[in-house]
Amino acid sequence: MKSLELYKPLKWWYTGQTFGQDTVCIDDNEKLVSGSGAGVCPAGFVSFYQKNGLKGHNGIDVGADMWQPVYASTDGTILEISTEANRGMGVIMITDEKYFFEGGDYFARTLYWHFAGVNVKPEQKVRIGDLIGWADSTGKATGPHLHFELKPMLYDTQGKLYNVFQDNGFYGAVNPEPYLQKQSAYELKTNLEKLKDSIAELASKIQDYLLRKT
């Protein structure tokens, strides 16, 4: 069984909040501020993660510019395009084969959040480095960035996906950092593919600009 390899979904990689950290606080008005760590928050605030049933941050945050392209970190299939109050717009995908990670052979479910827009649709097959969307700060975020998650998955006897570590305190997510390669997914693309991405990015920005004017 091949070991899992994830390729960085952004061209450059500046990690902000890491997996398991508990440094974000929230008040009754949904205002976010930084705490001093370990769930310690200013007066009137509580841990954002504990409030949402988590031990801490269940992914890694990577700094990004508005509309910065985000690329698929693995080969696989798009499961869904989702929009949530906390995480904003996101893309969820699954590998088509098992890999060895976290001590077993699992399918790798990767989740990408806080998008401005997406470039894929459910059930679409994607390859490492395919453009899947653009970074933003949708949902509850203090600025534009990519929230990236990894979850080990299996299929039950009915063919339904289930989360292997659902009760681990991170909604089944595990730290993706040990599986990240030095290369970005973008670096694996050909020059022609990169040109197509640039055209798609420009078209999306123009469309967004026109929509904002109407």
PLM region descriptions:
Residues 1-89, 98-102, 127-128, 137:
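Surface-exposed, glycine-biased beta-strand/turn segments
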Residues 119-144:
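Beta-rich strand-turn-strand
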Residues 79, 133, 177:
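Nucleotide phosphate-binding site architecture
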Residues 61, 92, 111, 134, ...:
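Conserved beta-strand positions that form and line the central face of beta-propeller blades
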